[in-house]
Amino acid sequence: GVEGWDIPDGYLCPPIPGRADYIHHLADLLAFGNDGTIPLGHSVRGLDVGVGASCVYPIVGCHEYRWRFVGSDIDAVAIESSSRIVALNPFLAEVVECRLQPSSADIFRNIIQPDERFDFTLCNPPFHASPQEAAAGSQRKFRNLGHSRGEKVVLNFGGQANELWCEG
């Protein structure tokens, strides 16, 4: 199990089975370049862009495949939360490093160090381009579920703005 896995109030709580599916799919992709065998162990290194407050991808990747990770995020609270989870779990402490991205305009700059190499990068980007698009998606979902009775629809999910929407 994972000790101290707690997400700060108001942060995105990821559905773990779907996130595990992403990691297993990534493992299958890595196997294509490894004679059909999923690479295991600390020689495999991944970069999780937008690690979030939950650190879910590094947790699953380390547990299932013993991979090493760098997790980056533009949110200091998310990095603090993920770093705390890592520190409380010996199986993560030596193989996961959380780094704060000081510039929301950059993805790799300030995160990837000179001569640092990764076998893969992964990202679970925000689903919406704007708060308005997120609200429209919630309204559509409620209508499709037969709940359109004219009442005001709130978002059917939680999270910080940078977890939920971004331009592009």
Indicate where each model-derived feature is located:
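Conserved class I S-adenosyl-L-methionine
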Residues: 39-53, 70
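S-adenosyl-L-methionine
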Residues: 72-123
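Short, glycine/acidic-enriched loop or turn micro-motifs at the edges of active sites
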Residues: 51, 76, 127
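Mobile active-site "lid"/loop adjacent to the S-adenosyl-L-methionine
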Residues: 125-168
